[in-house]
């Protein structure tokens, strides 16, 4: 029986498949100390509920002298992960901030990775406890530098799409423009960092130096009408208008997540939500059919094309949670690869503190299993090498294309389990 020790926050609700629409808050009422099990591919996965919470100080300064900005992604270095004699766990956690401060527009924020010491002492009781089970301490900041040793930037990528011998990369002011979103760790200590601007994946050394680039399939590269005059990876308002950008990753919905399979042989990359050609109306509820690529990195860490390209259907929900029809797709924020054909994915609404609207309830925040068994592999077809759509928004995938199967597993919205750690699901409440 396999326990998901890689997950730091655990709670559960298990149903066969995603419903077409979650029209009211999707909550889990499993009591503390009660575990649940899901079987996938002959393995049992056990969810022991929410067993730990930690608080990280907001006044920490990183190695570049900036206030600490994370976590767009975080991954445990499995070479360091240990269970200690007292039942606690410890290891090294690497975290990735995105494009920096979002208070006065985009800035020249250099991409970086934060190395942290992690200690985790699970609390398996039903008692109300303080938020002290998980502790993190910053050890060092790894600045990502390009092939010439200069830092990257986070401003809008309006520059050329070729730099230092690499094509189809986002640039600005002669620098690589990176909005870091996904992180994976190779056995040799090097990293994969995915970029939301370009839907690109960078391979960087353990010290942060770029070693190579994985450019995405053509289907994920932005495409604009010829009359618009736009090209490249710009996210300017005129370029991303409906009817102007006709294909490729949607702005601010690029390569959100990457991870390596446990054996290190395959890299999975997942767009945050649907491409523009798969949702031509560019409405929020039509962003449900996203794209997954699988790369064989066993011999070459930066292959030129994927061995797998699949459609993954995200859940949809009523943003107000009042029983209405779907008006949003639950975009994904992270994946954990389990095998070349299965992974975990975190899909969620955008409701909650910091969303700018605390009047809406929390509706959907769930970690699910995804299996590629039976799904249509589109690698090498015009769906991947061109802009042939796989879907038309909410109307479903095209005939002959089978999306990956999704099974909910860990429902983060468990009021009872959250409350015992002092977390209030009332989005307007202090500490929620």
Over which residues does each language-model region extend?
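Gram-negative bacterial Sec-dependent N-terminal signal peptides
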Residues: 1-20
């Amino acid at each position: 029986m396999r326990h998901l020790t890689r997950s730091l926050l655990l709670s559960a609700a298990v149903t066969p498949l995603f419903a077409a629409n979650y029209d009211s808050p999707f909550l889990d009422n499993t009591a503390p100390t009660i575990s649940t099990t899901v079987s996938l591919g002959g393995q049992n996965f056990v969810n022991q509920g929410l067993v730990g919470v930690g608080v990280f100080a907001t006044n920490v300064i990183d190695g570049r002298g900036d206030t600490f900005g994370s976590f767009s992604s975080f991954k445990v270095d499995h070479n360091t992960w240990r269970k200690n004699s007292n039942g606690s766990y410890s290891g090294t956690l690497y975290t990735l901030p995105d494009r920096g401060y979002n208070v006065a527009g985009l800035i020249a924020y250099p991409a970086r990775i934060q190395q942290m010491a992690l200690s985790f002492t699970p609390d398996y009781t039903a008692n109300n406890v303080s938020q002290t089970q998980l502790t993190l301490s910053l050890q060092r900041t790894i600045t990502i530098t390009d092939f010439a040793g200069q830092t990257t930037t986070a401003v809008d990528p309006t520059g050329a799409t070729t730099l230092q011998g690499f094509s189809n990369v986002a640039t600005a002011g002669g620098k690589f423009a990176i909005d870091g979103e996904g992180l994976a760790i190779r056995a040799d200590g090097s990293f994969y960092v995915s970029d939301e601007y370009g839907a690109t994946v960078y391979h960087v050394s353990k010290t942060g130096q770029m070693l190579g680039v994985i450019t995405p399939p053509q289907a994920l590269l932005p495409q604009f009408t010829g009359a618009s005059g736009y090209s490249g990876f710009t996210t300017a308002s005129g370029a991303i208008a409906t009817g102007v950008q006709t294909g490729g990753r949607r702005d601010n919905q690029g390569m959100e997540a990457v991870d390596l399979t446990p054996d290190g042989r395959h890299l999975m990359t997942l767009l945050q939500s649907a491409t523009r050609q798969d949702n031509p109306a560019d409405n929020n509820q039509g962003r449900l059919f996203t794209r997954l690529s699988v790369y064989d990195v066993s011999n070459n860490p930066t292959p030129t094309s994927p061995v797998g390209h699949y459609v993954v259907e995200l859940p949809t929900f009523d943003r107000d949670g009042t029983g209405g029809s779907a008006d949003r797709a639950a975009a994904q924020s992270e994946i954990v690869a389990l095998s070349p054909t299965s992974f975990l994915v975190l899909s969620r609404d955008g409701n909650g503190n910091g969303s700018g609207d605390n009047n809406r309830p929390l509706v959907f925040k769930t970690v699910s299993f995804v299996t590629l068994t039976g799904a249509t592999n589109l690698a090498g077809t015009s769906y991947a090498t061109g802009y042939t759509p796989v879907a038309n928004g909410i109307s479903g995938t095209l005939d002959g294309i089978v999306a990956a199967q999704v099974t909910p597993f860990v429902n983060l919205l468990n009021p009872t389990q959250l409350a015992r750690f002092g977390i209030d699901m009332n989005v307007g409440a202090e500490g929620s």
